[in-house]
Each structure stands twice: as structure tokens, then as C-alpha cells.
């Protein structure tokens, strides 16, 4: 029999704590994040990360070990087909705990535990296309490394994107042209005769 954790247990008995953590883990994998008390979130974190590690392995034994805890077949399927492969290259730290304000009724400290989202392939492609096009994120962060290579490939594949970027730069007036226009406007106002 495993040694129970020291200190107060969630729910009172070890069996209730085990079921409580199983239900919290199921809800976490089903919804991607849940709001609960800080104590429950801290106890759930290693429990859920262990299940994600089993899902990364992906073999039959790992699936059976997860099925002991998570009784919902659709959640187990999601865990092994989507969540596990998403974190294949990540060595740990699959969840994040964000502290929230106290609960209204009893002022219990609340927290949100959620799965750390990695950028999907589609999101990565969109951000690289925006950097290559010169919009949104281009001013904040210039492409580096593999991103720069992908942006160059995108420019080579799509000459229209490069042409659009060149036209946009050509259409933008320079600071000197704007200053000259302003000076001409003020001179025109000064030379008008008063009636």
C-alpha cells in the first residue's frame, strides 16, 4: 500500500483525495484549464504532468495506466492523440498555475491551472507570414534563425508578398516630404489676404 501524503489531505480520506485528483485531471484535459483553489491546483500539478508524460510515451501500458485514473475514454483519446504529441519535445512543465483573487463566499485563495500552449504549426506559419509581409509583429521582433529562413522561403515562393511590401514602403511618405507639405501649407495660409 502506498504511503499517504503527510499533512491534511484533500477531501479527508486518501480514497476521496485520489478520486478528487482524478476528476480534476479529467476536467483539466477536457477543457485545457480549470479554476480551483490554490491547494488543489498545487496538488493537481504533478499528478497531471505525470499523466501527460505517460501520454507522451503512447504505448499500451501507458494508456492502461492513464485509464486507471481518467475514466473518460474521449478524454484519454484526446490526451494521447493531441496533448501528448504537442509536448513531445518538451521535457516537463506542461501546466501553469496562475493565482487569482479570493473566492467571494469564503475568501479561499483561488488559482487557475492550465495546460501550457505550444504554438501549433498553423499559428507558426501565420506569424512567419506576417513577419515576412511586414505587419503586426515585424516592428517588435525581427525574424531570426529558422524563422528568418522560413520568411526568406516564403518571399521566394510568393513574389506577390514581396511586391506588396515594396509597394507599401513606396507609398509611405518620408518625414522630409511631410515636413515640406506642412511648410507649404503654413506659407499658403500666411500669404492669403484678409478680407
UniProtKB/Swiss-Prot annotation:
Pfam families: Ribosomal_L17 (PF01196). GO terms for biological process: translation. InterPro entries: Ribosomal_bL17 (IPR000456), Ribosomal_bL17_CS (IPR047859), Ribosomal_bL17_sf (IPR036373). Keywords: Ribonucleoprotein, Ribosomal protein. One of its GO terms (cellular component) is cytosolic large ribosomal subunit. The keyword Ribonucleoprotein applies. Residues 132-195 are annotated as: Disordered. One of its GO terms (molecular function) is structural constituent of ribosome. Residues 159-186 have a biased composition (Low complexity). Part of the 50S ribosomal subunit. Contacts protein L32. Belongs to the bacterial ribosomal protein bL17 family. HAMAP family: Ribosomal_bL17. This is Large ribosomal subunit protein bL17. It comes from Parafrankia sp. (strain EAN1pec).
Amino acid at each position: 500500500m502506498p504511503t499517504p501524503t503527510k499533512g491534511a489531505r484533500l477531501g479527508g480520506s486518501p480514497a476521496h483525495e485520489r478520486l478528487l485528483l482524478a476528476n480534476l485531471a479529467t476536467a483539466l484535459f477536457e477543457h485545457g484549464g480549470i479554476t480551483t483553489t490554490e491547494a488543489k491546483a498545487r496538488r493537481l500539478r504533478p499528478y497531471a504532468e505525470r499523466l501527460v508524460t505517460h501520454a507522451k510515451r503512447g504505448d499500451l501500458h501507458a494508456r492502461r495506466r492513464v485509464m486507471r485514473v481518467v475514466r473518460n475514454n474521449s478524454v484519454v483519446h484526446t490526451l494521447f492523440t493531441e496533448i501528448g504529441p504537442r509536448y513531445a519535445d518538451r521535457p516537463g512543465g506542461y501546466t501553469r498555475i496562475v493565482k487569482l483573487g479570493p473566492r467571494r463566499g469564503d475568501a479561499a485563495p483561488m488559482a487557475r491551472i492550465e495546460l501550457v500552449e505550444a504554438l501549433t504549426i498553423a499559428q507558426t506559419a501565420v506569424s512567419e507570414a506576417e513577419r515576412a509581409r511586414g505587419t503586426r509583429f515585424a516592428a517588435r521582433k525581427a525574424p531570426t534563425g529558422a524563422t528568418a529562413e522560413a520568411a526568406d522561403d516564403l518571399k521566394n515562393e510568393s513574389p506577390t508578398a514581396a511586391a506588396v511590401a515594396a509597394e507599401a514602403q513606396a507609398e509611405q511618405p518620408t518625414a522630409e516630404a511631410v515636413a515640406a507639405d506642412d511648410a507649404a501649407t503654413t506659407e499658403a495660409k500666411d500669404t492669403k489676404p484678409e478680407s
